[in-house]
């Protein structure tokens, strides 16, 4: 889909559905006024050679009418750099024009230890594209899995020219904990890119990477200021006294505004009948985990009416894997319960009878894989 505006601060259109299948669409506007869309797609069933076989397609794009031009689609990458090696999940394509030539950069290898970034070149936006002889230009696949403080699964990248005239690449990666679990999820990283030769190369993109907080030259570090979210070590405290909810709080499968009410006493959550075990919108505010070591706490006033009512805090991977720590009712009594859901099966780890006349503070502390 496409949404558009003349002012990025407001006036965005309703989503415009583009008529093709696949994932990761990217628009390219050429300097001659023409435009194109590239995206990942599955090959025709009769042409699928192995599991994970995917293609990159390109379409002419009608800017005036916000649609792809029917019948203009063409496969410009089949499988990946070398289909004979059965590469998987070629995706996330972007086209760049430099010195009169067209460069197609894609992710290859799938979200995991074989993830990488590869690049192709052509004299025409619709190909044919030839792969660089130094592919991949970014990956962590060749290094020991047990290396310390690692960044892994590097790929799914994009390029930008910075205010210093140099190129930089942003890409996705992970910072797994000591048991190789990815509780912080996929995150965005940045590296300088050397494009002094024919092809761009991520500097340090082919050596073992470690997370740092260096900023590109010429860029002011506004982390935690002027609306930018903090990074590194920090304390975030929200008493919900503002009339507008902080953007760091997010909803799941639906807008948070559907269940939050900012009152003079703080935040009031209007509960849905669904819960976090279901694949439905839930009346839950989430804060994305940014650290492998952290402490988080919430203070609430809550008096459940029956055994179906439950409120508290959660450490949430998805609807099948999570912890909940909160208050419910059994008979005439109120209980504080710690419950774990694993593979969709819930089990109570502990419970204690409590009074609900005063506010209750719930806290979780994480240290690597221990919560």
Enumerate the language-model features and the residues they cover.
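Carbohydrate-active catalytic/glycan-binding domains of CAZyme proteins
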Residues: 1-371
């Amino acid at each position: 889909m496409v949404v558009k505006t003349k002012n990025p601060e407001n006036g965005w259109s309703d989503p415009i559905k583009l008529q093709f299948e696949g994932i990761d669409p990217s628009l390219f506007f050429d300097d001659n006024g023409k435009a194109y869309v590239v995206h990942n797609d599955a090959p025709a069933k009769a042409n699928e050679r192995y599991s994970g076989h995917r293609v990159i397609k390109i379409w002419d794009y009608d800017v005036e009418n916000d649609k792809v031009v029917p019948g203009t689609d063409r496969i410009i990458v089949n499988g990946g750099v070398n289909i004979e090696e059965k590469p998987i999940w070629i995706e996330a394509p972007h086209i760049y024009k430099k010195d009169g030539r067209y460069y197609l950069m894609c992710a290859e290898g799938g979200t995991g230890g074989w993830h990488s970034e590869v690049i192709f070149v052509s004299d025409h936006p619709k190909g044919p594209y030839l792969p660089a002889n130094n592919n991949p230009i970014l990956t962590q696949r060749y290094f020991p899995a047990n290396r310390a403080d690692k960044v892994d699964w590097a790929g799914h990248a994009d390029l930008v020219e910075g205010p210093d005239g140099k190129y930089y690449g942003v890409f996705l990666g992970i910072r797994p904990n000591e048991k190789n679990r990815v509780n912080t999820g996929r995150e965005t990283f940045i590296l300088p890119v050397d494009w002094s030769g024919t092809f761009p190369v991520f500097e340090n993109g082919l050596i073992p990477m470690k997370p740092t907080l260096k900023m590109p030259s010429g860029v002011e570090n506004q982390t935690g200021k002027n609306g930018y979210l903090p990074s590194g070590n920090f304390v975030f405290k929200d008493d919900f006294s503002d009339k507008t909810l902080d953007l760091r709080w997010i909803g799941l499968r639906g807008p948070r505004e559907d269940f939050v009410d900012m009152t003079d006493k703080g935040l009031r959550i209007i509960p849905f009948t669904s819960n976090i075990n279901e694949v439905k919108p839930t009346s839950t505010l989430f804060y994305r985990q940014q650290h492998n070591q952290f402490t988080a706490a919430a203070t609430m006033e809550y008096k459940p009416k029956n055994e179906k009512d439950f409120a508290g805090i959660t450490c949430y991977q998805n609807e099948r894997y999570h912890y909940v720590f909160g208050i419910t009712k059994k008979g005439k009594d109120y209980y504080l319960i710690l419950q774990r859901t694993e593979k969709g099966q819930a089990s109570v780890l502990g419970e204690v009878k409590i009074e609900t006349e005063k506010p209750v503070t719930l806290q979780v502390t994480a240290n690597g894989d221990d919560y």
